[in-house]
């Protein structure tokens, strides 16, 4: 199921980047009118920045259409930042991180029940360059041919931690970090490359698919990344709308 879900997210990101603006006015009007007729439960989703487009343009509208009495509000950032926000009192109902570490930390700290965690999605780490222009680089191995490399901060951004692991295993991390600019989340990295502020960058496949201004050169080499890129999701124990939160998590698991 993970591979099918990844395919849906990738396809959705590419299609929606072109078609999402087409019918927003009518659907928004009908949604507003329906909301007036019934009470609405609002849940807060804290999710990795790499999933923002998939959620806002496809998954949340689909869920709200099927569950008229539930509204989902999203908060998107690096998984490390979201973990800290939850620990500091953020009233999140559902958490979806771009790595297992942040989810495991919240399980250990009793914010989430281990049995509620679902490994929902497996992503890929890719090397991107601006769509326009001639790239100096062609692979993870020769990335230091670029003068500016965009990466997520390994301390708080899972995509950055994955990049560090990849380049460490390829024996070129020390050279890479000398040319790296570190973003606060993976979306910032994507935007730097899309705008040409960086010659190349490391993001997830879902991010690359969501932008028409970048192109993927290659996936991370086999065996360079020992840690699977897993996106776990779970409802938080202290959610004030646990039934609605559980319903949303179950929806995400459906095919």
What do the predicted segments below correspond to?
Residues 113-116, 221:
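Short, P/G- and charge-enriched loop/turn segments at secondary-structure junctions
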Residues 1-24:
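Sec-dependent N-terminal signal peptides of Gram-positive bacterial secreted proteins and lipoproteins
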Residues 74-83, 92-106:
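Ligand-binding clamshell of periplasmic/extracellular solute-binding protein-like
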Residues 69, 91-92, 198:
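Short, high-confidence coil segments that cap the C-terminus of an alpha-helix
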Residues 116-125:
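Short, glycine-/small- and polar/acidic-enriched structural segments
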Residues 90-91, 114:
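Short glycine-enriched, charge-decorated loop/helix-capping segments at active-site entrances
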Residues 21-65, 80, 87, 99-100, ...:
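Exported/periplasmic ABC-transporter solute-binding proteins
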Residues 67-73:
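A generic structural motif
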């Amino acid at each position: 199921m993970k591979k099918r879900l990844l395919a849906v997210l990738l396809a959705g990101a590419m299609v929606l980047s072109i078609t999402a603006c087409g019918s927003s006015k009518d659907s928004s009007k009908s949604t507003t009118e329906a909301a007036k007729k019934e009470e609405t439960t609002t849940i807060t989703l804290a999710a990795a920045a790499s999933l923002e487009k998939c959620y806002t343009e496809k998954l949340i509208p689909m869920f709200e259409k099927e569950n008229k009495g539930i509204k989902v509000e999203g908060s998107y950032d690096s998984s490390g930042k979201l973990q800290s926000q939850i620990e500091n009192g953020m009233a999140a109902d559902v958490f979806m991180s771009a790595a297992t570490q942040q989810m495991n930390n919240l399980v250990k700290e009793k914010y989430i029940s281990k049995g509620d965690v679902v490994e929902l999605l497996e992503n890929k780490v890719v090397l991107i360059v601006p769509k326009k222009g001639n790239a100096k680089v062609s692979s993870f191995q020769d990335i230091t041919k670029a003068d500016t490399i965009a990466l997520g901060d390994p301390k708080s951004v899972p995509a950055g931690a994955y990049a560090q692991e990849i380049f460490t295993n390829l024996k070129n991390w020390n050279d890479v970090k000398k040319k790296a600019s570190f973003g606060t989340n993976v979306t910032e990295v994507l935007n730097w490359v899309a705008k040409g502020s960086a010659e190349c960058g490391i993001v997830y496949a879902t991010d690359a698919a969501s932008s028409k201004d970048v192109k993927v050169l290659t996936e991370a080499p086999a065996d360079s990344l020992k840690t699977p890129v897993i996106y776990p999701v779970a409802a938080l124990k202290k959610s004030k709308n646990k039934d609605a939160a559980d319903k949303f998590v179950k929806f995400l698991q459906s095919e």
